[in-house]
Regions:
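Primarily the internal scaffold of c-type cytochrome electron-transfer domains
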Residues: 1-58, 65, 70, 117-118, ...
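Short, structured interface segments
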Residues: 11-19, 125-148
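Short, charged, low-hydrophobicity "junction" segments
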Residues: 15, 19, 99-106
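Amphipathic alpha-helical scaffolding segments comprising HEAT/armadillo-like alpha-solenoid repeats
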Residues: 39-51, 72-84, 102-114, 135-153, ...
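Short coil turns that connect the paired helices of HEAT/ARM alpha-solenoid repeats
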Residues: 51-55, 83-89, 114-120, 157-161
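Structural detector for internal amphipathic alpha-helices that build alpha-solenoid repeat scaffolds
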Residues: 27-39, 58-72, 78-81, 89-103, ...
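Long alpha-helical HEAT/HEAT-like repeat alpha-solenoid scaffolds in very large eukaryotic proteins
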Residues: 129-132, 142, 147-168
Length: 185
């Protein structure tokens, strides 16, 4: 290398020693890159990463989120496991991945997370279910959904100095059928 008085072989050996045991990072990077462009083979590679509990939560969550772009029935069981993962980051990634499902299917799998212990997960579920009108659900479910939406609106309202908060609130209100309030937001 240019910064040491040693041969390239010395640098290569040092790098190999440093990165020993980290070969999985290459597979993860390749799967993520393929997932971002919906490349050939991305689905199975992402599904394998998402399903591996020994991997870091951030890797699994990213895999779930990207896997949703090309969701197949064969990976739906993996998503359901991800929604029950003990790590909220993995649950968050699984929720993001399931945004690709039609809203009527989304409600059925995400409803149990309306009361998730993690606020980040609950807020993501609120966005995923914003097209579901509480009035379309039985009274107990409607109350839970209304509470979730109130929590989401309060969270977005904390950042009203940001234009995207206004856009997010307007989108939610429009999804709920309140076009006049959406225009005001």
């Amino acid at each position: 290398s240019d910064c040491h008085d040693a041969a390239q072989a010395w640098s290569d050996a040092g790098a190999a020693d440093w990165w020993q045991g980290r070969a999985g990072a290459d597979a993860f990077a390749a799967a993520i890159a393929a997932g971002r462009v919906q490349g050939v083979g991305a689905g199975p590679a992402l599904a394998a990463i998402a399903a591996e509990p020994a991997l870091p939560a951030i890797q699994r969550a990213t895999a779930f989120a990207l896997l949703g772009a090309n969701i197949q029935p064969s990976v739906l069981a993996g998503f359901l496991e991800g929604l029950h993962d003990p790590d909220p980051l993995v649950r968050l990634g699984a929720v993001r991945g399931l945004m690709a499902l039609p809203v009527q299917d989304r409600y059925g799998v995400l409803a149990p997370l309306i009361a998730d212990s993690s606020k980040s997960v609950r807020l993501e579920v609120a966005q995923a279910l914003s097209q579901v009108r509480p009035s379309s659900r039985p009274s107990e479910e409607a109350a839970a959904l209304e509470g979730l939406f109130e929590e989401w609106l309060a969270s977005e309202s904390a950042y009203l100095e940001r234009p995207e908060s206004h856009a997010n609130i307007a989108g939610h209100l429009a999804n709920q059928g309140d076009l006049a309030a959406a225009e005001q937001a």
